[in-house]
Every structure is written in C-alpha cells, then in structure tokens.
C-alpha cells in the first residue's frame, strides 16, 4: 500500500493555483522493477494559456510521455498545475518547455518528452517538442496520435 499521507491535494478541495509557479507537483513512489522501463502518458487536449502580448487565449493539445524512475507525478496535482496556465501569459514555446522541466524537477524520470500542438493564431500553428535525451532502450513509445495541422485540407 502506498503511503498517501504526504499528499495535500488528492482527495481534498483545492483551489486552482494562481500561476504555474504557485502550483505544487506532488509525487508518489514508483517501483519500476526489472526489464524495459514503463512509459506513462498524459494527454491534455484542451490546454489553455494567455498570449503575453495581447492577453488573448491560446489553446493546445499537450502530450507528455515519461519513463518514471522512483517517482510518479500525482495526476490531480498535474491537473491543477496544467490548469494554472489559464491565467498565465507566456509564449507557446515557453509554456511547453516549462511544463516538461517542472515535471522533470519533481519526478527525476529516466526520460521525458513533451509535445505541444498549438492551435493556429494568426494563421500559423506552432508545434513545440522537448525531451531530456534519447528514449530508454527497450521502451515502447507509441505515436503521440496527434495529426499534423491540415487547415481546410
């Protein structure tokens, strides 16, 4: 049985943090065992943030894959962290990489990749990709399942 006494958000009413910096990513222990590493995927198809110049909303489909070592990111804390971007002004690239770096800092995974598939503003979709290095040998990495933007196509 996993000790959940250190978790402050799971099972509790928690207000959405005012900013990503104020959000707390909590972790739970993970026993990865022998053999190829497990890959954990989080998909956030309705991610939102704000343009830092105009204040207009930006929307993205975010896919996060990581190979945990000794810790998993607790999913409610991740949800609150992701939601905290709704009032955060930053460029697409900064948001995407910030998310990846925060998860790496919290969990210290064997490997992580993040894809931010941003919906067009001004007619240009922006896709942002970041990873910590080469994927672990033997890991099963399915396609992200996000089709390239096609417009009217």
From Swiss-Prot:
The UniProt entry's GO biological process terms, in alphabetical order, are: queuosine biosynthetic process; tRNA modification
Q: Where in the cell is it found?
A: Cytoplasm
Identify the catalytic residues.
51, 58
Short name of any one Pfam family annotated for the protein: QueF
* Disulfide bond residue pairs: none
> Would you tell me the Gene Ontology cellular component terms?
cytoplasm
Q: Where does substrate bind?
A: 73-75, 92-93
Pathway linked to the protein: tRNA modification; tRNA-queuosine biosynthesis
State a single Gene Ontology molecular function: preQ1 synthase activity
Reactions listed under catalytic activity: 7-aminomethyl-7-carbaguanine + 2 NADP(+) = 7-cyano-7-deazaguanine + 2 NADPH + 3 H(+)
Has keyword Cell inner membrane?
Answer: no
Enzyme Commission (EC) number: 1.7.1.13
Keywords on record: Cytoplasm, NADP, Oxidoreductase, Queuosine biosynthesis
Main enzyme class: oxidoreductase
What job does the chain carry out?
Catalyzes the NADPH-dependent reduction of 7-cyano-7-deazaguanine (preQ0) to 7-aminomethyl-7-deazaguanine (preQ1).
Q: Which family does it belong to?
A: Belongs to the GTP cyclohydrolase I family. QueF type 1 subfamily.
Q: What is this protein called?
A: NADPH-dependent 7-cyano-7-deazaguanine reductase
Primary gene name = queF
């Amino acid at each position: 049985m996993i000790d959940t006494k250190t978790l402050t958000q799971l099972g509790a009413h928690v207000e959405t943090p005012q900013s990503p910096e104020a959000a707390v990513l909590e972790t739970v222990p993970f026993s990865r065992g022998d053999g190829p590493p497990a890959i954990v995927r989080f998909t956030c198809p309705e991610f939102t943030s704000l343009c830092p110049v105009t204040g207009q909303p930006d929307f993205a489909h975010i896919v996060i894959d990581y190979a945990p070592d000794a810790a998993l990111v607790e999913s409610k804390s991740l949800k609150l962290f992701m939601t905290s971007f709704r009032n955060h002004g930053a460029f697409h690239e900064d948001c995407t990489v910030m998310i990846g770096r925060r998860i790496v800092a919290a969990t210290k995974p064997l490997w992580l990749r993040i894809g931010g598939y941003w919906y067009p503003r001004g007619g240009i979709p922006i896709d942002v990709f970041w990873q910590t290095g080469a994927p672990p040998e033997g890991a099963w990495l399915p396609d992200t399942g996000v089709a390239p933007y096609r417009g009217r196509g």
